[in-house]
């Protein structure tokens, strides 16, 4: 949620920043609501002052034995009017809040201008894509041939965009998740969390999924619960309505959870394989930072994701999302894209974002400055560390052999009982 004072003070600046990210902003609606809110507050304060003055006069008249009935009637009318105005004020405040909840975050000044993913600048590349002596296959073909992925039975069980993992693929999925979590917890200082996989509407609103993106979510019929699209949602909201101590910052949580997405608007995209599923596993990183140091934390978080790919020996590149390609809650985002030889393309495997105080304002996440003073909003960050299914895709495609087998990266072998290679059953 944007700072109300910023909108009041610099509406043109906000409108320009949001236009840069392709979002139209009806400032006239906000201005009308805000002016009405302020007018109501001013009228209520004036009437309360009048009521207080009249109450004092009634007390004086009673002490003097004078007839205060006319003034008491006036007081009753003032109280009724104040109640009516208070009710209207709350309605207008709710309308302002609803308007604010639908407005995306403002891009940081360091974010490049652009209209689409075609305008995202590349930051760096790591690793050299392997030169194959044969035509590399896509992961779904290899995984099916080796008996590890079963899309046909998944379709029978649930429908399209689901997968059944068997034998080595199930074990590799678990191995990847454990490797990711172990690295984040033991080396990067994250606290491991197992959160609920269902959350309520307030929690979804806190991180920005609601109210705007309800069609992208799975809601439990008859319950006010949603399946989480990412562990960012429960991890960030662990501190909703909390006041942290500045000494606690920065702090980080990591979780491995299933994620559930409707993939609305993705019809026809990545219809085969594991790239775009309704249910997938992801290890998520969430950090809470001091406002003056949150962009340093973003660079650290990106590094925490990159080191996993480096240890797996998977080539990747990092891009900065331009203004027109950013997520709703983000002030700045890096995408990390892993090389998939079967597709002859880099595909996203991690997205690391600094949301500034945007989510903190929605969820009420504050910290108390070390030197005292009024609590301030913390900055929140989130990043994939990593998408487990896509990591499995990358391992299969990059480590495939001409005989159809797949070599297991050395870093995963301790998690897979020393297995070195996957061969046909």
UniProtKB/Swiss-Prot annotation:
Catalyzed reaction equations: tRNA(Ser) + L-serine + ATP = L-seryl-tRNA(Ser) + AMP + diphosphate + H(+); tRNA(Sec) + L-serine + ATP = L-seryl-tRNA(Sec) + AMP + diphosphate + H(+)
Pathway terms, separated by semicolons: Aminoacyl-tRNA biosynthesis; selenocysteinyl-tRNA(Sec) biosynthesis; L-seryl-tRNA(Sec) from L-serine and tRNA(Sec): step 1/1
Gene Ontology MF terms in the entry: ATP binding; serine-tRNA ligase activity
Gene Ontology CC: cytoplasm
Residues reported in the UniProt entry to bind L-serine: 230-232, 284, 384
EC number of the protein: 6.1.1.11
Main subcellular location: cytoplasm
InterPro entries in alphabetical order: aa-tRNA-synt_IIb, aa-tRNA-synth_II, aa-tRNA-synth_II/BPL/LPL, Ser-tRNA-ligase_type_1, Ser-tRNA-synth_1_N, SerRS_1_N_sf, SerRS_core, tRNA-bd_arm
Superkingdom assignment: Bacteria
Compartments where located: Cytoplasm
Gene Ontology biological process terms from the UniProt entry: selenocysteine biosynthetic process; seryl-tRNA aminoacylation
Binding positions for ATP per the UniProt entry: 261-263, 348-351
Keywords recorded for this protein, A-Z: Aminoacyl-tRNA synthetase, ATP-binding, Cytoplasm, Ligase, Nucleotide-binding, Protein biosynthesis
Family as reported in the entry's similarity comment: Belongs to the class-II aminoacyl-tRNA synthetase family. Type-1 seryl-tRNA synthetase subfamily.
Assembly with partners or alone: Homodimer. The tRNA molecule binds across the dimer.
Task of the protein: Catalyzes the attachment of serine to tRNA(Ser). Is also able to aminoacylate tRNA(Sec) with serine, to form the misacylated tRNA L-seryl-tRNA(Sec), which will be further converted into selenocysteinyl-tRNA(Sec).
Domain notes per entry: Consists of two distinct domains, a catalytic core and a N-terminal extension that is involved in tRNA binding.
Name this protein carries in UniProt: Serine--tRNA ligase
Gene: serS
């Amino acid at each position: 949620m944007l700072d109300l004072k910023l909108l009041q003070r610099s509406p043109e600046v906000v409108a320009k920043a949001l236009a840069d990210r392709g979002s139209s902003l009806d400032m006239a609606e906000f201005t009308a609501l805000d002016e009405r809110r302020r007018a109501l507050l001013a009228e209520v304060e004036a009437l309360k002052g009048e009521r207080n003055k009249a109450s004092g006069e009634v007390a004086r008249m009673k002490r003097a034995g004078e007839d205060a009935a006319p003034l008491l009637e006036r007081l009753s009318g003032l109280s009724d009017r104040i109640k009516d105005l208070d009710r209207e004020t709350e309605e207008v405040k709710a309308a302002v809040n609803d308007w604010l909840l639908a407005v995306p975050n403002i891009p940081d000044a360091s974010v490049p201008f652009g209209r689409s993913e075609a305008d995202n600048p590349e930051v760096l590349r790591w690793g050299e894509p392997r030169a194959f002596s044969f035509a590399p296959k896509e992961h779904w073909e290899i995984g099916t041939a080796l008996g590890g992925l079963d899309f046909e039975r998944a379709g029978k069980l649930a429908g399209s965009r689901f997968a059944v993992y068997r034998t080595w693929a199930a074990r590799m999925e678990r191995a990847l998740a454990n490797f990711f979590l172990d690295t984040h917890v033991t080396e990067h200082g994250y606290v491991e969390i197992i959160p609920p996989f269902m959350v309520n509407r307030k929690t979804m609103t806190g991180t920005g999924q609601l109210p705007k993106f309800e069609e992208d979510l799975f809601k439990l019929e008859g319950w006010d619960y949603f399946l989480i699209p990412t562990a960012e949602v429960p991890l960030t909201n662990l501190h909703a309505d909390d006041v942290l101590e500045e000494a606690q910052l920065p702090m980080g949580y990591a979780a491995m959870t299933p994620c559930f997405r409707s993939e609305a608007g993705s019809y026809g995209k990545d219809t085969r394989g594991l790239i775009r599923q309704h249910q997938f596993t992801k290890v998520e990183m969430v950090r809470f930072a001091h406002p003056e140091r949150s962009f340093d934390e973003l660079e650290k978080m990106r590094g925490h994701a990159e080191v996993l790919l480096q240890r797996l020996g998977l080539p990747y590149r990092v891009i900065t999302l331009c203004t027109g390609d950013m997520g709703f809650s983000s002030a700045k985002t890096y995408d990390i894209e892993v090389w998939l030889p079967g597709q002859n393309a880099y595909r996203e495997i991690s997205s690391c974002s600094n949301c500034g105080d945007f989510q903190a304002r929605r969820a009420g996440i504050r910290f108390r400055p070390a030197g005292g003073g009024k609590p301030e909003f913390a900055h929140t960050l989130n990043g994939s560390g990593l998408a487990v299914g896509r990591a499995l895709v990358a391992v299969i495609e990059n480590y495939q052999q001409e005989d159809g087998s797949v070599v297991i990266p050395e870093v995963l072998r301790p998690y897979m009982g020393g297995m070195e290679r996957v061969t046909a059953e």
